[in-house]
C-alpha cells in the first residue's frame, strides 16, 4: 500500500503526456529503477582522457599547471594502442568474466568510458574505488602494452593520476568523475551534492529540463541519504522532486510556455499562484484592507508548486538574457515576491531565498570568485537549500550562451565527452518516467 495518496501525471521535456496517475512514491530514489541506476552508475563511472595522457607524456608536463620536467619526455602511442590498452585494463578492473564491468573507447580512442564492477563498490566503504582502480589499471596497462621501462613508469603514473598522492586531489590527472573527492564534502551525506553544476549541464548536453531533472534527482537523493527526507519530511522531498525536477502535471512546462515570450519573474509568480488556487492548493485566509493573505492546508504541496515556479522563473529570466549570471537574483526575488505579495512561505521555507543572498555575493559581488556553473549543493554558500536551489542554477547554465568565464566547455569537457554517452545521464527525465515501478 502506498504511504501517500498523492498521484501525478508525468510529462516529457516537450510537454507530452507519458503516464497518468503515478504515485509519488514511484519516483522515490529508494524505489525508482532509473534513479537507482543513475546513482549507482555515477558512483562507478570514470572518464579517462587517453589523448591527454599521450600529450602529457610527450611534453613531460604532468602534475598540473607549472609542472614541467624537461628531459622526461616519452614518445608513447597511447591512442594508436587504445584497443589493446583498454582490453588489458578491463581484465584488471573486472572481478570475474561477464560481470557488469564496462570499458568502452570513444572518440576514435581518445577517450574511455569505464564502469567498475558493482562488486568492487559493494566491497568498498565509499566511491573512491572507481577512479583509483581505474587509474591503477590503465597505468599498468599502458606500461605493459607500450613497453615502458621501469625508470619511466613513474611518468605514466603522473600522466594518469596527476600529482596525487602529494596532493589531495588528482591535480593534473587525466581521469574524471562526476563525484568530487570525499575530502571536500561539507559533511556526512553530501557526496551526491558535490557535483559541479557545469558537469550536470555537460552530461545532459545543455538540455534545460534534462539538466534540471538530473540536478533535482541528485539533490533529493542526497536528502534521503543525509536523513532530511525521513518521516514527516519525506513527502516534501518527493513532491519537490516530482514538480520541480520531473515536470509533474506539466506544471513547469506550462509556466514556461505561458511566460516565455514576454513574461517576467513577477508574471511567473502570478501564474503559480493562480494555478495553485485553481488546484485547491492555496486559498485566501483573510483580507486586510484589500490585501489578500493566502494560506494553505498542505505546505509540502505548495512548496512543490512554488519550486516548479522558481525553475520556470529562472528559465524565463535567464533564458531572455541568454546569460546565467543573474540566477541568484531570480531565486531571491521570486521568493521575495511570493512572500510580500501573497503572505505565503517561499520555496524551502526561506532557505532558497537565504541561499540566494549569499550566492549573489559569492558569484558576482565584491567577492566575485566564480560564476554559477562552478557551484554545487556541497558549497558552503549553496548547501543550505534542501535540494531546491541548485536545479535553478543548472537551468541557468544550460541556457547560457557563452557569457561565463567558467563555462561547461571549459570545466567539464571530459565529462561531456564521456558521461553524455550514458543514456540515463543524458536524458534522465525520459528514463525516470519510463522505469517507474508500477
Swiss-Prot record:
GO biological process, one term: methanogenesis
Cofactor(s) it depends on: coenzyme F430
Pathway: One-carbon metabolism; methyl-coenzyme M reduction; methane from methyl-coenzyme M: step 1/1
Chief place of localization: cytoplasm
EC number: 2.8.4.1
Annotated positions binding coenzyme B: 369
Annotated residues for binding of coenzyme M: 367
InterPro entries in the record: Me_CoM_Rdtase_asu/bsu_C, Me_CoM_Rdtase_asu_N_sub2, Me_CoM_Rdtase_bsu, Me_CoM_Rdtase_bsu_C, Me_CoM_Rdtase_bsu_N, Me_CoM_Rdtase_Fd-like_fold
An example Gene Ontology molecular-function term: coenzyme-B sulfoethylthiotransferase activity
Keywords in alphabetical order: Cytoplasm, Methanogenesis, Transferase
Short name of one Pfam family: MCR_beta
TM regions (residue ranges): none
Keyword tRNA-binding: no
Catalytic activity annotation: coenzyme B + methyl-coenzyme M = methane + coenzyme M-coenzyme B heterodisulfide
GO cellular component: cytoplasm
Bound cofactor: record note: Binds 2 coenzyme F430 non-covalently per MCR complex. Coenzyme F430 is a yellow nickel porphinoid. Methyl-coenzyme-M reductase is activated when the enzyme-bound coenzyme F430 is reduced to the Ni(I) oxidation state.
Function: Component of the methyl-coenzyme M reductase (MCR) I that catalyzes the reductive cleavage of methyl-coenzyme M (CoM-S-CH3 or 2-(methylthio)ethanesulfonate) using coenzyme B (CoB or 7-mercaptoheptanoylthreonine phosphate) as reductant which results in the production of methane and the mixed heterodisulfide of CoB and CoM (CoM-S-S-CoB). This is the final step in methanogenesis.
Entry similarity comment: Belongs to the methyl-coenzyme M reductase beta subunit family.
Subunit note: MCR is a hexamer of two alpha, two beta, and two gamma chains, forming a dimer of heterotrimers.
Name of the featured protein: Methyl-coenzyme M reductase subunit beta
Organism: Methanothermus fervidus
